[in-house]
């Protein structure tokens, strides 16, 4: 879609939210300009938007400081959500029983690149 010159990456691991919920937010910012993506995340009411915004700002800082890219020409090239580890916990139930619940974690990988 875009002709990418250089790119910069940022990762955020072990986010305490399920990958399914996190993927809803990352779908909003894929293939957007960085300024538009930040505005989209700023006004989103989802809890995951805070973590995605944090990772996106880290990718922007990496692009500016490490690779010397121009912030005005940056585009979110990839926003990938991966499955993290799962914590298993017990919840006490009636008659001395206990049920197992799973607490899901996610990994987030964001790549921004400079376009012409």
UniProtKB/Swiss-Prot annotation:
Single Gene Ontology MF annotation: structural constituent of ribosome
Gene3D superfamilies: Ribosomal protein L22/L17 (3.90.470.10)
One record GO biological process: translation
Coiled coil: none
Entry keyword set: Ribonucleoprotein, Ribosomal protein, RNA-binding, rRNA-binding
CDD domains: Ribosomal_L22
InterPro entries registered for this protein in UniProt: Ribosomal_uL22, Ribosomal_uL22_bac/chlpt-type, Ribosomal_uL22_bac/org-type, Ribosomal_uL22_CS, Ribosomal_uL22_sf
Pfam families associated with the record: Ribosomal_L22
Example of a GO cellular component annotation carried by this entry: cytosolic large ribosomal subunit
Keyword Lipid metabolism: no
Quaternary context: Part of the 50S ribosomal subunit.
Family: Belongs to the universal ribosomal protein uL22 family.
Its biological purpose: This protein binds specifically to 23S rRNA; its binding is stimulated by other ribosomal proteins, e.g. L4, L17, and L20. It is important during the early stages of 50S assembly. It makes multiple contacts with different domains of the 23S rRNA in the assembled 50S subunit and ribosome. The globular domain of the protein is located near the polypeptide exit tunnel on the outside of the subunit, while an extended beta-hairpin is found that lines the wall of the exit tunnel in the center of the 70S ribosome.
HAMAP family reported in the protein's UniProt record: Ribosomal_uL22_B (MF_01331_B)
Protein name: Large ribosomal subunit protein uL22
Origin species: Orientia tsutsugamushi (strain Ikeda) (Rickettsia tsutsugamushi)
Gene name in the database record: rplV
